[in-house]
Amino acid sequence: MPAMSVTAKLQRHAGNSYGYRFEGGDRCVVYSTDSEHKFTEPDESTSFARFFRNADVVIFDAMYSLADAISVKADWGHSSNIVGVELCQRAGARHLCLFHHEPASSDDTIDRVVKDTRRYEEITRTGAPLYVSAAYDAMEIDL
């Protein structure tokens, strides 16, 4: 197994939260959950796009819809699928794995969110495609 480096990054969440970037060989995984990413903070968005840069997979807190994340759930410490797409596209990441789903969401709701997220990614794409999936119990991702 190649040597691995781990980089931690402070995120926006009550009580603090850290994202982690795991790099080993030519592979990179970023874990960024329990974090509220905001479009209104350009310096922060740029900083996270750099943190996500060229990741093979970004495991991303997508608890809320964009509408909820910027209105009724603002400052609750969680993000949306749309923000995940925007950051990953800017970063040149290859796979966005939506994680930390709203506990009240049914499987059908999560499937619809994935479908909508894929469509959004498709219509906003300016570079290489970003694969979108939803995390589930016991999921394994081959790098």
Predicted feature residues:
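Cap/insert and terminal regions of metallo-dependent hydrolase folds
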Residues: C28, E36-Y131
